[in-house]
Amino acid sequence: MSLGQRLALLAIRLQEPQRVASFQRLCGVEVPLGSPKAGEDAETEVRGAPGDPRRRPRQSGADGSPAKPDCCGAPNGVRNGLAAEPGPTGPRRAGSLRRNSLTGEEGELAKVSNLPLYYLFCFGTELGNELFYIIFFPFWIWNLDPFVGRRLVIIWVLVMYLGQCTKDIIRWPRPASPPVIKLEIFYNSEYSMPSTHAMSGTAIPIAMILLTYGRWQYPLIYGLILIPCWSSLVCLSRIYMGMHSILDVIAGFLYTILILIIFYPLVDLIDNFNQTYKYAPLIIIGLHLILGIFSFTLDTWSTSRGDTAEILGSGAGIACGSHAAYNLGISLDPSLHTLPLAIPPLTVTLFGKAILRVVIGMLLVLFVRDIMKKVTIPLACKLFGIPCHDLRQARQHMEVELPYRYITYGTVGFSITFLIPYIFSFIGIS
């Protein structure tokens, strides 16, 4: 057997849903006794891996393309068989915290015997969700180092955009359920390969160490410990949640390393362009909008389209905000002769100002996001003649989802790097 054949066989084995289910059982996640799914696991074991002739073929649309979710939210790949609601003594619904508001799906019933692992992996998977991003990036920009924060956003946008587009090109379904238990359902209508959670969970810690080491004084060993811990936690959490095969996670990790090798040397050039070039805002807005339109043409509706527009809008808004802040002198990076920067001692004043910036800043961010959401969706529906009585259906149109996500999160990003730092400066907590 040649090396290529061995690698192909290994890839097939790593994509088998049975391996995901085995990992879940190892971590204490099982189908509860009496669940309708419990009787289906044995049948699933004989379906085989991708490429195996015994494997049940994926249902296709009328044009031969992979099946997509309908208005009720049938996801890509195999639709989950949801168990009945638990009674007072029934098992916990382990995935209900990530209910998908756009498709109405919820996590499956599962018997979780290891709660510490469950909460650990819930935390790990949140490191790749919007809640984490909307806290993490502003915290860097407001409290730690805007220089590093801006560049982290550039890398994050690049990695996530390429990952989301690659998903819609490859179009591999999520692991079949059964035998896999879907503890999280929020992203189930997206494709699987590669894992963008794994990509984000790899790119952020690596980029964070690359950007800070030598700029800040700290032992390198801290970074060498942080990178594998962060990345492995996020990657394993996606297998634990039943969202990805082992192959998806490995591919996401390796894909991220390749992207960083190619594009990391350009990050400094991109950030300097965003801040200093006279017409940078026009180019930034136009380029990100074109990339968003392109990504929307790769496939029909899924939650990944809105996520892509959200990522691009955030990146464009943060870049434009940094341009305005730089040219108005609101946010200036320390001069090179002051490097490396020493980590200041934690005082009551320093800690108090940091907390104030986080609380005031996040309240303003949430306010801006809520206002823009209420304005952009009805406005887009009115402009393009789309009924807006059912927001779920309306947001499945590109004419609504793209401007809503792009404008809303573009405004949020602009607020993070310009409007909110200006307010901090005005009230004396910058």
Swiss-Prot record:
Region (Phosphatase sequence motif II): 194-197
GO molecular function: dihydrosphingosine-1-phosphate phosphatase activity; sphingosine-1-phosphate phosphatase activity
Sorted UniProt keywords: Cell membrane, Endoplasmic reticulum, Hydrolase, Lipid metabolism, Membrane, Phosphoprotein, Transmembrane, Transmembrane helix
Region (Phosphatase sequence motif I): 167-175
Any Gene Ontology CC annotation: endoplasmic reticulum
Bilayer disposition of the protein: Multi-pass membrane protein
Modified positions (Phosphothreonine) in chain numbering: 103
Region (Phosphatase sequence motif III): 237-248
Subcellular localization: Endoplasmic reticulum membrane; Cell membrane
Catalytic function, reaction form: sphinganine 1-phosphate + H2O = sphinganine + phosphate; sphing-4-enine 1-phosphate + H2O = sphing-4-enine + phosphate
Broad class of the protein's primary localization: endoplasmic reticulum
Function: Specifically dephosphorylates sphingosine 1-phosphate (S1P), dihydro-S1P, and phyto-S1P. Does not act on ceramide 1-phosphate, lysophosphatidic acid or phosphatidic acid. Sphingosine-1-phosphate phosphatase activity is needed for efficient recycling of sphingosine into the sphingolipid synthesis pathway. Regulates the intracellular levels of the bioactive sphingolipid metabolite S1P that regulates diverse biological processes acting both as an extracellular receptor ligand or as an intracellular second messenger. Involved in efficient ceramide synthesis from exogenous sphingoid bases.
Similarity remark: Belongs to the type 2 lipid phosphate phosphatase family.
Name of this chain's protein: Sphingosine-1-phosphate phosphatase 1
Naturally occurring in which organism (per UniProt): Rattus norvegicus
